[in-house]
UniProtKB/Swiss-Prot annotation:
Family: Belongs to the conotoxin T superfamily.
Keyword Repeat among UniProt keywords: no
Record's keyword terms, sorted: Amidation, Disulfide bond, Pyrrolidone carboxylic acid, Secreted, Toxin
Annotated GO MF terms: toxin activity
Domain notes: The cysteine framework is V (CC-CC).
Cystine bridges: 2-9, 3-10
Tissue specificity as recorded in UniProt: Expressed by the venom duct.
Predominant location: secreted
Modified-residue entries (Pyrrolidone carboxylic acid), positions: 1
Signal peptide residues on this chain, from the entry's feature table: none
Entry's localization field: Secreted
Record has Ribosomal protein as a keyword: no
Protein name: Conotoxin Vi1361
Length: 12
């Protein structure tokens, strides 16, 4: 899932 405050979380 993508984090609103951390868009890069989507890449992981």
């Amino acid at each position: 899932q993508c984090c609103p405050t951390m868009p890069e979380c989507c890449r992981i």
